[in-house]
Amino acid sequence: MSFRDVAHEVGVSKSTVERWVARTHGQRLDRVDLGNRKPGRAWNRVSWLIEQRIAELRIQLRKSVLGEYGAKAIRTALEAELDRPPSHAAINRALARRGLQDGVRRTRRPAPPKGWYLPDVMAARAELDCFDFVEDLKIADGPLVDLLTVKSLHGSLTDAWVLQRSTEATLPCLIARWQRDGLPRYAQFDNDNVFQGAHHHAHVVGRLSRLCLQLGVTPVFVPPLEHGMQNAIEGFNALWQAKVWQRHRAVSVSELQALSDRYIAAHRARTRTLAEAAPARRPMSGHFELKTDARLRGQLIFVRRTNDAGEVHLLGLRFAVSRTWPHRLVRCEVDFDHDCIRCFGLRRREPTEQPLLATLPYQSPNKPLR
């Protein structure tokens, strides 16, 4: 077989095949380096003596009192011996060449799509409003205040209100926003008592959840102590603090609110194209009154992580989902119309695969709030 035929079969150039043959001439095939890099040693690679010293320090420092033997500790030790010690990256490469790295290299996987735990949001068929609090902002010579923030996932419609953290102060803000911008399909919250209601009683559905249900908005509560699902609103919280709180010195609550309103207006103007391309929002009536004793209708969604027995805790109760799904995320849809809870398995690696794990009977007592 000719060089040209081999090159065509393996998909490389003819010169590459010639170089391989030249390198293997008179040698065993398992001892030959067929890499495409230039032969020889890189000009900026650490010398063999320094590489040997790095390996020795790795072993010595591991047995030292501190027990710190990473690249930073090795470089600190080399600073006392060399005028120009190698960088952290060079030390790590030397350790890798000698097989002295005992940690497994972290596999970085692509992030799942926005709103991946809600199929309609992931497919951009529905909008999601994310709510959160920035707590304990100290006005100069004034009170401690909190900031209620909201950002829509697809349209980036933002709002921020300076207030005292309570359900009574939060409800009018939600109503005013939705009367102006329209109703989303979903509203997402963390598990704060202001949003979810009391945690120490069973079957409790708070006033904010009842507001959403009566407006046809599905409340979504993210899992406690989990990262990722609140990234959109937490990123906006950091942006607001950097661009408003840290840049200006407000002497009163009204002045801070005015500064915030000015920033929100500028932010909305900059993201107008995103809002126009976002999923449609339903109009809300200008005359709405919350009825806390009305029968619960619609769905309430809890994203939770199961325990070692495949159980989840929500609404002050414990539910068995699946023993084959321990320590994993599930989306629990509490359906008040059909008296059941549907539990779907969630995986960040495969966001489109959300199998139904269990359908649990559940009937809410529909007790009015006091």
Predicted features and spans:
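RNase H-like two-metal-ion nuclease catalytic core shared by retroviral integrases
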Residues: 189-190, 195-242, 253-256, 261
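Double-stranded DNA-binding cores of transcription factors and transposases
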Residues: 1-25
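Basic, flexible linker segments flanking DNA-binding modules
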Residues: 28-128, 279-287
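Short, polar/flexible loop-turn hinges at active-site or ligand-entry regions and domain interfaces
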Residues: 61-64, 81, 245-254
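Mobile-element integrase/transposase regions
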Residues: 48, 84-85, 95-151, 157, ...
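Mobile genetic element proteins and their domesticated derivatives, centered on retroelements
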Residues: 6-7, 17-20, 54, 74, ...
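C-terminal, beta-rich DNA-binding module of retroviral/retroelements integrases
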Residues: 264-370
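Short, solvent-exposed loop/turn segments at secondary-structure boundaries
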Residues: 66, 161-163, 197-202
